[in-house]
């Protein structure tokens, strides 16, 4: 059988199963070792508590209730022997001593974490099982087996205490979800998420509580004593969707972003409703009568709990972002601030009975953009992987201890109550989703289809939050808490096992859109931002203040004030694309210096454009090509005359009062200047000829520039034209054949000879060279480039924006620009 497994699944069970058996055996035998008198450490009395054995958990340090063996003090023993006339015997030096109580708590915690990690490795080694059964189901099964093994050796299995769950296991999962929350999808669907989280949870709680109260009235003697407040409290516990269970299942099926954010966002934001309802009904259960003022205060406490948690999270997020400004010299502690401030936000919210989950989400969302702008790339990687590791281990321990606590807990079974609870949970979820979606689709542009509604209703999983809240119930006020806990475990197991295992085949069967694994391209990002600005402008014109309008307001406020306070240095002013371009240029310059080459130096135009964008940047550290002041000034003139400032949108439109555009006059003047420049260029190109001078200098053909110079090879019988940049506002720079050059052009051998080397070193310009041999009377001379005789040269400067004259049919080949 071992050989068959090794050949089929590609792994060797003997390599991993013995380790698992050793860990399980150690966990089971530790209580046995503890009961055999190994608690003789002096620290054992300080960590021993008085709680019953079933209260022990991974964070609880209580021991078995048996009386410890007290050793007499060595000094008293010596005095006793001396009083009876004996000599004290010398104690032998202990070569090996066992002091397990001294290390019991961290040792057991390490063993449980090691068991969780080995289980995750074992599940993913067997792809057949992991593709069919969700990981959460397998972990619960492992917990059931470990709990049964511990109970089989005669010991009480550890129980998942609520304080351990809420203070140590839940925060890492929520922080990981809040820090890496897809903010765009979350904000765009915030209204839908709030309706599902608030209205849907209230509907489920009261619908389930009311129907269960009716069932208790007719269900028999065992459940007749359950009152309305008891069933409403139970309904508020079991109605909330659990974020841990949703994350564990939805991350494996890779559902699309819309459905994932709707279900997961609902599970995050319904925490405030669950906390308020839980404390409200728990307080009402101890009252003799409940008045209208109590109900109003309970309704008011919902806003206090929700908004108070958000406020606490925002405050700690801002403090964390501000602190990260000053960590540039001590990069090692940067990740620690993220963890500490987030955890402090959660504990501060729990201190005032606010929503700790809302505080964690708010702190993670607020601090992330500013912290990542201040910290190094290595710190960002550390934060990412540590949060993922921490949340994964916590999630694994939660599901394992759900199974262990099921074996360890005391249960009370009632078929009527348990089956009714399970049935009413499913009915309430389906009805709530259908009714709320019908209302939501009236206001949504992208409607939720029936397939989407089915996945949302089917994805309402329950988990450890409901279990921990049920365990917190006081048996004095709620004598049926064991029955409630049994019903909660039944609902959790049904949703995790049945719904969790069947949701993947149903998604494939219904052909629900899956999540795209690839990241969006730069083109998609640019178009997305363009559409955001476009929709913001449309809302401004229409006078409609939608979420695009408020998003634009927040972005402006963020850039103007917040970034300057929370982001260090010039990074708060520099756009991301320009910063990335500057970083790449610096990297290329460093590589260029190290290699000793000159092939990667940025071009002159690129360098000058970047200097204009960053006027305060220090250019001494960058390797730039030498530019003469005249050429740089010439380029600046061209940019000033041809570039225009972007017009700003009007803030609002009113048919009675129109806001004047301050750039309108400058815009009209610029259009006039461009029109004059085009007319001047047209005149230049139309009359670009050399006038005839008797018989020796016939007229030249009209000069033209080819549209694609790289597509042609230079010909010997064509003149060569190069363009020297000049300002279009300076017509004096356009020097058409003046009187001094006429004589040089007409003379055959009077001009200086231009060698090819001098021609290459000379500045660019339109150079026309006349051939040596004169033509016969009545025919045109043809100017050829590169003549061996001493030709005459003539320069014509033209603006870079001039494309040259348009080709006319019937004329010769176009001139080829020089040097291209």
From Swiss-Prot:
Residues 519-549 are annotated as: Interaction with CHP2. One of its GO terms (biological process) is negative regulation of apoptotic process. Residues 544-549 are annotated as: Confers pH-dependent PI(4,5)P2 binding. Its main location: membrane. GO terms for cellular component: apical plasma membrane; basolateral plasma membrane; cation-transporting ATPase complex; cell surface; cytoplasm; intercalated disc; membrane; membrane raft. Signal peptide: none annotated. The modification Phosphoserine is found at residues 603, 606, 609, 652, 697, 701, 707, 727, 730, 733, 790, 792, 801. It is found in: Cell membrane; Basolateral cell membrane. Expressed in kidney, brain and stomach. The chain crosses the membrane at residues 103-125, 135-152, 163-180, 191-219, 227-253, 257-287, 292-326, 333-345, 355-375, 378-408, 415-442, 449-473, 480-509. Activated at acidic pHs. Inhibited by cariporide and eniporide. Inhibited by amiloride and 5-amino-substituted derivatives. Phosphatidylinositol 4,5-bisphosphate (PI(4,5)P2) and phosphatidylinositol 3,4,5-trisphosphate (PI(3,4,5)P3) bind and differentially regulate SLC9A1 activity. It is linked to Defects in Slc9a1 is the cause of slow-wave epilepsy (swe) phenotype. Mutant mice display slow-wave epilepsy, with a neurological syndrome including ataxia and a unique epilepsy phenotype consisting of 3/sec absence and tonic-clonic seizures. Mutants show selective neuronal death in the cerebellum and brainstem. Mice display also several other significant abnormalities in growth and development, and less than half of the mutant homozygous animals survived to weaning. Most died by 35-40 days. This is Sodium/hydrogen exchanger 1.
């Amino acid at each position: 059988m071992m050989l068959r497994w090794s050949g089929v699944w590609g792994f060797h069970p003997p390599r991993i199963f013995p380790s698992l058996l050793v860990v399980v055996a150690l966990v089971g035998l530790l209580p046995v070792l503890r009961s055999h008198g190994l608690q003789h450490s002096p620290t054992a009395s300080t960590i021993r508590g008085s709680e019953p054995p079933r209260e022990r958990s991974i964070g609880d340090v209580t021991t078995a209730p048996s009386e410890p063996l007290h050793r007499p003090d060595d000094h008293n023993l010596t005095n006793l022997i001396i009083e009876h006339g004996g000599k004290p015997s010398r104690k032998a030096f202990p070569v090996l001593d066992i002091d397990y109580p001294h290390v019991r708590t961290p040792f057991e915690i390490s063993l449980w974490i090691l068991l969780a990690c080995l289980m995750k490795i074992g599940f993913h080694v067997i792809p057949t099982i992991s593709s069919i059964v969700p990981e959460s189901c397998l972990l619960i099964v492992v917990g059931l087996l470990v709990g049964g093994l511990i109970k089989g050796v005669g010991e009480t299995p550890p129980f998942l205490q609520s304080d351990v769950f809420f203070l140590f296991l839940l925060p890492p999962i929520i922080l990981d979800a809040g820090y890496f929350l897809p903010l765009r999808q979350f904000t765009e669907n915030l209204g839908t998420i709030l309706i599902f989280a608030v209205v849907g949870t209230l509907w489920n709680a009261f619908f389930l509580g009311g129907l269960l109260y009716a069932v208790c009235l007719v269900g028999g003697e065992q459940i007749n004593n359950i009152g309305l407040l008891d069933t409403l409290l139970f309904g508020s516990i079991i109605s909330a969707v659990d974020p841990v269970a949703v994350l564990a299942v939805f991350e494996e099926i890779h559902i699309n972003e819309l459905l994932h954010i709707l279900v997961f966002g609902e599970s995050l934001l319904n925490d405030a409703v669950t906390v308020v309802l839980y404390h409200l009904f728990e307080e009402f259960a101890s009252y003799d009568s409940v008045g209208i003022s109590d109900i109003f205060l309970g309704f008011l406490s919902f806003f206090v709990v929700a908004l108070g948690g958000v406020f606490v999270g925002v405050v700690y997020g801002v403090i964390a972002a501000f602190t990260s400004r000053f960590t540039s010299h001590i990069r090692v502690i940067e990740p620690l601030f993220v963890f500490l401030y987030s955890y402090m936000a959660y504990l501060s919210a729990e201190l005032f009975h606010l929503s700790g989950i809302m505080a964690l989400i708010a702190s993670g969302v607020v601090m992330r953009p500013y912290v990542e702008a201040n910290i190094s790339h290595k710190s960002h990687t550390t934060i990412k992987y540590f949060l993922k590791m921490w949340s994964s281990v916590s999630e694994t321990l939660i599901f394992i201890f759900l199974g262990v606590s099921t074996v360890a807990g005391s249960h009370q079974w009632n078929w009527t109550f348990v089956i009714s609870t399970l049935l009413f949970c499913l009915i309430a979820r389906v009805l709530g989703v259908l009714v709320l979606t019908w209302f939501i689709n009236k206001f949504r542009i992208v409607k939720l289809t029936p397939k989407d509604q089915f996945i949302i209703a089917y994805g309402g999983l329950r988990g450890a939050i409901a279990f921990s809240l049920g365990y917190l119930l006081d048996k004095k006020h709620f004598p049926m808490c064991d029955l409630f806990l049994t019903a909660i475990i039944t609902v959790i197991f049904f949703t995790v096992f049945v719904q969790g295992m069947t949701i993947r085949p149903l998604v494939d069967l219904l052909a629900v859109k899956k999540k795209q694994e690839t990241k969006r391209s730069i083109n998609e990002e640019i178009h997305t931002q363009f559409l955001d600005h476009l929709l913001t402008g449309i809302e401004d014109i229409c006078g409609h203040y939608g979420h695009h309008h408020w998003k634009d307001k927040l972005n402006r406020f963020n850039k103007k004030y917040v970034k300057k306070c929370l982001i260090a240095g010039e990074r708060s002013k520099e756009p991301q694309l320009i910063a990335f371009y500057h970083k790449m240029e610096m990297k290329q310059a460093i590589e260029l210096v190290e290699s000793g080459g000159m092939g990667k130096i940025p071009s002159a135009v690129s360098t000058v454009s970047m200097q204009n964008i960053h006027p305060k940047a220090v250019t001494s550290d960058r390797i730039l090509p030498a530019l003469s002041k005249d050429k740089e000034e010439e380029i600046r003139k061209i940019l000033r005359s041809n570039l225009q400032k972007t017009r700003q949108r009007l803030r609002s439109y009113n048919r009675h009062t129109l806001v004047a555009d301050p750039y309108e006059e400058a815009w009209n003047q610029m259009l006039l200047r461009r029109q004059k420049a085009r007319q001047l260029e047209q005149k230049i190109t139309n009359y670009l000829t050399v006038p005839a001078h008797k018989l020796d200098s016939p007229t030249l053909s009209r000069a033209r520039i080819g549209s694609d110079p790289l597509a042609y090879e230079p010909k010997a019988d064509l003149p060569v034209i190069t363009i020297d940049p000049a300002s279009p506002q300076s017509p004096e720079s356009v020097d058409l054949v003046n009187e001094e050059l006429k004589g040089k052009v007409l003379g055959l051998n009077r001009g200086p000879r231009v060698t090819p080397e001098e021609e290459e070193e000379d500045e660019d310009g339109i150079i026309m060279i006349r051939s040596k041999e004169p033509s016969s009377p009545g025919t045109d001379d043809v100017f050829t480039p590169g003549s061996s005789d001493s030709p005459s040269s003539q320069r014509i400067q033209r603006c870079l924006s001039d494309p040259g004259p348009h080709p006319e049919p019937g004329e010769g080949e176009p001139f080829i620009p020089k040097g291209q």
